[in-house]
Design a protein with these regions (language model features):
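A conserved beta-turn-beta hairpin within the catalytic core of GNAT-like acetyltransferases
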Residues: 85-97, 125
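Conserved acetyl-CoA-binding loop-helix of GNAT-fold acetyltransferases
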Residues: 102, 108-121
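A short, internal acetyl-CoA/4′-phosphopantetheine-binding micro-motif in the GNAT/acyltransferase core
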Residues: 97-108, 131-133
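Conserved beta-strand-loop-alpha-helix junction that forms the acyl-donor binding cleft
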Residues: 128-143, 147, 157-160
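A short helix-loop-beta-strand connector motif used in the catalytic cores of GNAT acetyltransferases and
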Residues: 50-68
Length: 175
């Protein structure tokens, strides 16, 4: 990444323009997920599926943090960090990366890696990152950034077609 490029992460709830930007690129995010054909993500335009409803849920969920990923003061991506929930048979986690998106034109520039490091530092605790095994680009990205961030000190499991990385992040200065 160019050393003159500044990447930051900010609370998208604090800015109407960040929310509008996320709404404007949400369809691109769903397009990226569509080839996975998991059945979890509705087909665009499907009866009963309304994208604004999903975004409204994110912004009203008190257990989630909606973040704008910013390059040189302009949004280029978003992330949603969810508080972990205990699930039978799984180790407890404090945070999960529920959603993560970088605009296509901004990919492979180091922005995602930098944003992830900022997010992990901001939310100290036990993390779980989950990606579909059928999404090799996501698996490769998350393995690289988690290994770099943790210096290889993480656990990975493959369960039911999902790859899960679990690790401890650093001290959080603020949210």
């Amino acid at each position: 990444m160019d050393s003159t490029v500044t990447v930051s992460v900010r609370d998208a709830r604090a800015s109407d323009s960040d929310r509008l930007w996320i709404e404007s690129v949400y369809r691109n995010y769903l397009d990226d997920l569509a080839p996975l054909n998991t059945g979890i993500f509705p087909v665009l335009g499907e009866v009963g599926h309304r994208e604004p409803d999903q975004i409204t849920r994110w912004f009203s969920d008190s257990t989630a943090f909606v973040l704008a990923i910013v390059k040189n003061s302009k949004p280029v991506g978003f992330a949603m960090v969810a508080r972990g929930t205990s699930q039978p048979g799984r180790p407890p986690v404090d945070f999960r990366m529920a959603e993560f998106f970088i605009a296509r034109s901004q990919r492979r520039l180091g922005i995602g890696r930098t944003a992830v490091q900022l997010i992990f530092n901001r939310f100290a605790g036990r993390w779980e990152i989950t990606e579909y095994l059928r999404n090799p680009a996501a698996v490769s990205f998350w393995r690289r950034v988690v290994a770099l961030y943790t210096q290889g000190n993480y656990q990975e499991r493959i369960v039911n077609g999902e790859v899960r990385q679990m690790f401890q992040s650093g001290t959080a200065p603020r949210r």
